[in-house]
Amino acid sequence: IKNGNLWIIPDLNRASILRRAHGWYGDMNYKFNGLKKSDRDYQTVQKVKKLITNPQIELIFNLHDGSGFYSPQRESYQRNPNRWGQSCVIDQAELDGARFGHLQLLSEKAADQINQHVLHQEHRFHVKNTHTASSDKVMQKALTYYALRTGKPAIGLEASKKLPTHQRVYYL
């Protein structure tokens, strides 16, 4: 960031972070579409939605822990296309009309930058495009897809849960 502001929301789901689990009341990342008011995370999700739609916000990075190690090709049980760790996740390649709408390009640059400083070659990042609108119904409930639907570009950055905490923090 060369100018402007960086807003950070720390510990959005503290209980989940401390337990290294998806969420005490369900995975909060998948509560951004169709959430009932009776859900215990409803108020928190509404606050995040309000932040996302703030006119000053031009790009969202959703920092996450992911399972295993994402790889475009299957290499092993822990390193394959069905895993999420060590990836830049996008719902689509482009968001037309947005200042930072070149999601594929931004994610590739981010992965390249991270990969220049990996602690071990097996920690390399890759871009994972979920093609959410056309093929991933579960991801249509995600924070990043909510952001896209409001005209805000969003990228998920996933560090592998297989890594110790200090390394996950290093990568994110």
Task: Show which residues each predicted segment covers.
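Structured catalytic-domain cores with a bias toward divalent-metal coordination
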Residues: 1-172
